[in-house]
Amino acid sequence: MLTKEFHEVISHEGIVSIVSWAKVEPHVVNTWNSYLIIPDDKTILIPAAGMRKTQANTEVNSRVKLTVGSKEAQGKKMGRGFLIEGNAEFLPSGPLYDQMKAKCPFTSRVLVVTVSSIEKTL
């Protein structure tokens, strides 16, 4: 599901936007492409140092939307990007947390996104 083209995009620095929602308006938080870990073709690991509102939202509604992109990854024009949808869970410990903590020592939890769809947007 997470294609070679997706991996090419996240190999360049760019911003990742994470959208979550519960009963009220959507909440958006950002991180960087370089912080992501992709352990398999349907899972994205994201370090969470803050993200308290995102976590509260996912405890009510686990669905999230992410956008990732980089102007350095050439597509038909300058840059490429993707819209990713999936389900999210925050983990404060365990093997996935340990993997993220080794890469991003500032993290207090790992946001695990199980991807259900991916669409090229740029």
Language model region names:
Residues 1-122:
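Binding-site signature for planar aromatic cofactors or substrates
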